[in-house]
C-alpha cells in the first residue's frame, strides 16, 4: 500500500508593507507592472501577457489596465496602501495603468517618468513600409 508523502512547499508569507513603489514598463508590445517595497523587493507583479492577453492585444491600454488591477490586488493583500509610480517606456498603456492603480484604492503620492531619451545616440531602425 502506497504511503502519502507529506509536502512542505513554501507558501507565500503575508508581509505588512504599507508604502511601496509601482514600476510600470510600457513598451509597444506589452506592459509590465512590478510593485516593490521601498528597498526594492518585489511584492507583486503582473503583465499583459500574464493577465491572459496574447499577441498584438498585449500592447493595448485595456491589457495594461487589467495587469495593473491584478498587481494592485496582490499588493493590497500584502497590506499596501500608498505607492509611488515610476513609468518607463513609450507604450500605449501608460495612462490606463495609472488610472487602474488609482481605481483599486491605492493612494498615489508621486508619479515619475524615467523614460530614456537619447541625446542623439544610436541610429534608429529604418521606417516600416507596409
Curated annotation (Swiss-Prot):
It is found in: Plastid, Cyanelle. GO terms for cellular component: cyanelle; ribonucleoprotein complex; ribosome. One of its GO terms (biological process) is translation. InterPro entries: Ribosomal_uS11 (IPR001971), Ribosomal_uS11_bac-type (IPR019981), Ribosomal_uS11_CS (IPR018102), Ribosomal_uS11_sf (IPR036967). One of its GO terms (molecular function) is rRNA binding. Keywords: Cyanelle, Plastid, Ribonucleoprotein, Ribosomal protein, RNA-binding, rRNA-binding. Gene3D superfamilies: Ribosomal protein S11. Its main location: plastid. Part of the 30S ribosomal subunit. NCBIfam families: PRK05309.1, uS11_bact. Belongs to the universal ribosomal protein uS11 family. This is Small ribosomal subunit protein uS11c. The lineage of its organism: Eukaryota, Glaucocystophyceae, Cyanophoraceae, Cyanophora. The gene is rps11.
Amino acid at each position: 500500500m502506497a504511503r502519502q508523502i507529506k509536502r512542505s512547499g513554501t507558501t507565500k508569507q503575508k508581509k505588512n508593507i504599507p508604502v511601496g513603489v509601482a514600476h510600470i514598463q510600457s513598451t509597444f508590445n506589452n506592459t509590465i507592472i512590478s510593485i516593490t517595497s521601498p528597498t526594492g523587493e518585489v511584492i507583486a507583479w503582473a503583465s499583459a501577457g500574464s493577465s491572459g492577453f496574447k499577441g498584438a492585444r498585449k500592447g493595448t491600454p485595456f491589457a495594461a489596465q487589467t495587469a495593473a488591477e491584478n498587481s494592485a490586488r496582490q499588493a493590497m493583500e500584502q497590506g499596501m496602501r500608498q505607492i509611488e509610480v515610476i513609468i518607463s517606456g513609450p507604450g500605449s498603456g501608460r495612462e490606463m495603468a495609472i488610472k487602474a492603480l488609482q481605481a483599486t484604492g491605492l493612494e498615489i503620492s508621486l508619479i515619475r517618468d524615467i523614460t530614456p531619451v537619447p541625446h542623439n545616440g544610436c541610429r534608429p531602425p529604418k521606417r516600416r513600409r507596409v
